[in-house]
UniProtKB/Swiss-Prot annotation:
Motif annotated as 'KMSKS' region, chain positions: 237-241
PROSITE patterns: AA_TRNA_LIGASE_I
The protein's name in its UniProt record: Glutamate--tRNA ligase
Quaternary organization: Monomer.
Recorded family membership: Belongs to the class-I aminoacyl-tRNA synthetase family. Glutamate--tRNA ligase type 1 subfamily.
Primary gene name: gltX
An example Gene Ontology CC term for this record: cytosol
Catalytic activity: tRNA(Glu) + L-glutamate + ATP = L-glutamyl-tRNA(Glu) + AMP + diphosphate
Alphabetical keyword list: Aminoacyl-tRNA synthetase, ATP-binding, Cytoplasm, Ligase, Metal-binding, Nucleotide-binding, Protein biosynthesis, Zinc
Gene Ontology BP term (one): glutamyl-tRNA aminoacylation
Reported function: Catalyzes the attachment of glutamate to tRNA(Glu) in a two-step reaction: glutamate is first activated by ATP to form Glu-AMP and then transferred to the acceptor end of tRNA(Glu).
UniProt keyword Cytoplasm, yes or no: yes
Amino acid sequence: MKIKTRFAPSPTGYLHVGGARTALYSWLFARNHGGEFVLRIEDTDLERSTPEAIEAIMDGMNWLNLEWDEGPYFQTKRFDRYNAVIDDMIVAGTAYKCYCSKERLDALREEQMANGDKPRYDGRCRHSHEHHADDEPCVVRFANPQDGSVIFDDQIRGPIEFSNQELDDLIIRRTDGSPTYNFCVVVDDWDMEISHVIRGEDHINNTPRQINILKALNAPVPVYAHVSMINGDDGKKLSKRHGAVSVMQYRDDGYLPEALLNYLVRLGWSSGDQEIFSREEMIKLFSLGAVSKSASAFNTDKLLWLNHHYINTMQPEYVATYLQWHIEQANIDTRTGPELAELVKLLGERCKTLKEIAESCRYFYEEFDAFDADAAKKHLRPVARQPLEVVRDKLAAITAWTAENVHHAIQATADELEVGMGKVGMPLRVAVTGAGQSPGLDVTVHAIGKTRSVARINKALGFIAERESQQ
């Protein structure tokens, strides 16, 4: 059996984390079986579908590196195909034209609800032999089987059964001639030879209707798997109030795609006690049988932990390719200062996101206007003048500018003045970075460079002198 899966988002908004997880599971299942993965844009909702949403979905898929083998297909470009199939069904008697007015259908619904019945179409036009003009407005309905049941073996939830008596004759073509979502999906899955439909649990109620249409077309029925929803950490459905829900918002917030993928794959799937999965491991180990039927809770702290792990374990050069975007957003000129891969090594341990790195690195590349007030008040005092003068001269005298030699200069200053390293290090840190926190002082001063470091120490000495004159 040829394995072929699809991800079929509706372009009415951004690619959210729930959709991204569904895409990931479909992609992994196809890759695990050496199959194919199709991207299909279900844009039949003409009023809500937008080009911006299509672009956002494609951007999200590309950023996550979930490459597709076919597509993207667009349902709006296949209306002729859908309508041809509907016309054939009318001839075959598996679909029929319905001329019931909106007023009649509204009255029927009100009557059924007043009687405590489930609102449903009563099938009046299914058995009608009334003559209607060719140009009289009508919809087309699917003639759903009226007895028996639909049973499908959900690969995550087990067997699910629906009575056909619970399913009315759904509309498959509107009065304006446009086919409806549930019908387009069926024809697409048939034409594209989809073997496995992996989607959210909100589609479970669509499945029996789609299976009945497939059977009416004598088309093969794919295997279905419905993934549970993602909740916030408070147990309620994930929404913007829980934080970012758009995939590209996580990009903007400084997450690596590997971290988000690793986090999403574990939201409902597991392989023993393993937490960290490379893309190759995900492909090798993934199975639908190991996907939980219970809802998952989104935990941002866990995602942050994973992101920090990947920033510090992936090749710095690779991480730097993603950091570049954040540097550009921060409008930092990196032409003078350390390479971005070096910056990843310098700040990766201290920062959990790439955005944090970009926000923390400016002093490596640009001059700062003022010292942090609290840090300067505490460390740029008259008592720091001599340590700064001595360490400045020792740094200026270094011929081979290495982090090791910088360390020796700082240590030699402390030894010469017979003071602790902190008496030299803290004023020096504030002098060269403008603040009271940084990576290791030797690597920081080395990355800033000799000329710039000496100039900043002189600036700090000037600050101390001015402070002394005001006392």
